[in-house]
Regions:
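Short S/T/G/P-rich N-terminal loop/turn motif that feeds into the first structured element of a domain
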Residues: 1-74, 82-97
Length: 97
């Protein structure tokens, strides 16, 4: 079952987001799903919110997210955001272009 996950990063900005992406992709950047080391991502959006930065994603399954978390979790921790707890909900409907 697909899931929707939201990461809120209080006090963070685009600089942290860009640093995480650079580390997770070995500096290649993230412009297509193939740039990520783990499969299963359906959609990704990120941007500033009051007091921080938010990332919202749709994953094919919780297992796919958990596999990817093993890659980006340590990066977030290394960059000072070990306490990030995502909000995860089951997706009722996912429409992609």
């Amino acid at each position: 079952m697909a899931i929707i996950v939201t990461f809120d990063l209080p006090g963070a900005g685009q600089e942290l987001y860009d640093a995480v992406i650079a580390r997770v992709t070995d500096g290649r950047g993230f412009t297509q799903f193939a740039d990520l080391p783990n499969p299963g991502l359906v959609s990704h959006a990120a941007g500033p919110v009051d007091g921080g930065f938010r990332v919202t994603e749709v994953w094919e399954s919780l297992e796919a997210l958990e596999t990817h978390a093993k890659t980006f979790g340590p990066v977030l921790a290394d960059l000072g955001h070990a306490d990030v707890q995502p909000t995860i909900i089951p997706a009722h409907n996912v429409v992609v272009r």
